[in-house]
Regions:
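Structured mid-domain segments that build the active-site/substrate or prosthetic-cofactor binding neighborhood
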Residues: 178
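Extracellular/oxidizing-compartment recognition motifs
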Residues: 1-80, 88-89, 105-108, 121, ...
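Flexible glycine/proline-rich, aromatic-decorated loop/lid segments
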Residues: 186-191
Length: 191
């Protein structure tokens, strides 16, 4: 009997194909059981949704599972490809996700990643942590980097907690200053 579980890797999929190797030729390897594990962040459920329509309830359940499959240590936009922490997920999806989940810890961690990735000139790259350094619009897009300003504000709006704003205020000002340095007549038009 052999049991194996990856410790540092996850992959989203609908189907899984298993091939075996390394056993004696002509001897069939018997696979007794394969079990997949659904892993995601431990954000606490704080709200629920149900209605009288079973189809709508099932759709909500599928969406809820899809959302959770994109929560590891960062919010990703898909669990089956690069799994990078694209920042727009925080501020565009954050408000709707907060109806069902307590995202304070996950978002505080995301803000720490953004702070760690902020450049000396104030730029907040489009992904955090920045494992891959992209160029141009895939690294410097205001609609992604603005998560650094919007997420603390949303946290305050939802919880009344000013801690993220206090902790990240200087970096937020640096990012807004960076955007100002790229603006023409006070209009940001790049990205």
């Amino acid at each position: 009997t052999e049991t194996w579980t990856p410790r540092f890797f996850y992959y989203g999929s609908r189907y899984l194909q298993v091939e075996t190797s390394g056993h004696d030729a002509g001897v069939a390897l018997q696979i007794v059981e394969l079990t997949s594990k659904f892993v995601h962040s431990s954000a606490e459920t704080v709200g629920t949704f149900t209605c009288a329509n079973p189809l709508v309830n099932r759709i909500h359940e599928l969406i809820d599972t899809a959302i959770k499959s994109n929560w590891q240590s960062v919010l990703t936009d898909c669990p089956h490809r690069e799994r990078l922490g694209w920042l727009e997920e925080y501020h565009l999806n954050g408000p709707s996700l907060r109806y069902e989940f307590d995202l304070a810890q996950l978002f505080a961690k995301g803000m720490a990643d953004m702070a760690d990735g902020q450049l000396a000139n104030g730029l907040v790259p489009d992904i955090a942590p920045e494992y891959t350094v992209f160029k141009d619009g895939f690294r410097d897009s205001p609609e992604w980097g603005s998560a650094y300003v919007l997420v603390p504000w949303q946290q305050y709006q939802w919880t009344g907690d000013l801690e993220l704003i206090r902790r990240r205020y200087d970096g937020m000002k640096r990012y807004v200053g960076y955007l100002g340095s790229r603006a023409t007549d006070h209009i940001v038009s790049h990205g």
